[in-house]
């Protein structure tokens, strides 16, 4: 996902320009927090912000791309850019200590020293505490750029010491249009209608990961799960792909079930159709029970991240029986 360039991700343009405007006017903060998920291009935006800070001939629209600093960045060889990424599932205290030590050294290119930390929510407690001192007293010409996927997982003492860059995520229509420009959408049907692929955004994570899914067989697998859940919930018996789910596939399949249940409730009192069939009219009590059931499915998705093993077929059959009982099917 990091292979994209800033210009290829139009929803990042406004946030990037806001960062450039502040820095161009010389009012740059010493610490910036970018609450932009990797699946939206968070690392791409973070790199562009680092380029803005380090560029020696900054233009009103961003880094010049031609100065010595920009050329070093292009070659991934800038001595004053210090990047920290998770080591496994965590950012560890030794990584932050080494970073803080590097930031005390004189800038080799005579400008700023920039620390770029991606997935900063993965700081363990010791690493977060080690970073706090640098956030409080960063030193002259030190700029920290922190990219996160989940600000809620950060210590308040970290977020309060950073300037959060405003960012507006793209809506589904913008994402669909972007995917069309990438020539990734399935061919229109016989009526000329384009298939809406954004239904699974919450499963894959965002537009960049959805693009990867469309390039591979992953998206088609998600679509198959949705079709097979619809058939299985109607018949009361597992069918097709749900009979042979592996432990690696079950989380995706249950995430799709969660989305299907929510869609079922949303459309139950409308004249719209679900999977080509008229939606049932459900009373509010049944709707509430189905919403609660969907929540149970989502909780299981989270538990499965750490469970050593699970009987996927039995679990799916249990959910089908629960659905039939709730809907008196």
Predicted regions and their residues:
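Clamp-loader machinery-focused feature within the broader ASCE/P-loop NTPase space
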Residues: 1-126
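Conserved adenine-binding aromatic site and its adjacent loop/helix in ATP-hydrolyzing domains
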Residues: 101, 133, 160
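Catalytic acidic motif of RecA-like/P-loop NTPases
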Residues: 118-124, 129-132, 136, 152
């Amino acid at each position: 996902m990091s292979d994209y360039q800033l210009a290829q991700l139009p929803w990042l343009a406004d946030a990037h320009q806001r960062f450039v405007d502040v820095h161009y006017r010389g009012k740059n903060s010493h610490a910036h927090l970018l609450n932009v998920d990797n699946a939206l291009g968070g690392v791409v935006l973070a790199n562009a912000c680092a380029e803005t800070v380090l560029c020696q001939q900054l233009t009103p629209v961003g880094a010049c791309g031609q100065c010595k600093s920009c050329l070093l960045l292009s070659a991934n060889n800038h001595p004053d850019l210090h990047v920290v990424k998770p080591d496994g599932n965590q950012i560890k205290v030794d990584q932050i200590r080494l970073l803080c030590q590097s930031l005390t050294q004189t800038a080799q290119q005579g400008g700023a020293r920039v620390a770029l930390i991606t997935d900063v929510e993965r700081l363990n407690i010791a690493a977060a505490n080690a970073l706090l001192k640098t956030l409080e007293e960063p030193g002259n010409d030190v700029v920290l750029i922190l990219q996160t996927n989940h600000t809620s997982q950060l210590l308040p003492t970290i977020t309060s010491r950073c300037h959060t860059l405003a960012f507006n995520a793209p809506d589904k229509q913008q994402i669909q249009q972007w995917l069309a420009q990438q020539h990734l959408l399935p061919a229109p049907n016989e009526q000329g209608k384009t298939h809406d692929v954004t239904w699974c955004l919450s499963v894959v994570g965002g537009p960049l990961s959805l693009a990867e899914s469309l390039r591979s067989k992953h998206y088609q697998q998600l679509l198959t799960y949705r079709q097979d859940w619809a058939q299985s919930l109607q018949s009361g018996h597992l069918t097709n792909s749900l009979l042979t789910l592996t432990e690696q596939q079950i989380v995706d399949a249950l995430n799709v079930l969660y989305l299907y249940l929510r869609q079922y409730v949303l459309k139950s009192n409308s004249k719209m159709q679900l999977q080509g069939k008229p939606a049932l009219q459900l009373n509010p009590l049944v709707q509430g029970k189905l919403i609660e059931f969907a929540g149970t499915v989502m909780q299981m998705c989270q538990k499965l991240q750490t469970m050593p093993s699970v009987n996927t077929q039995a679990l799916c059959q249990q959910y089908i029986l629960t659905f039939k009982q709730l809907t008196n099917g």
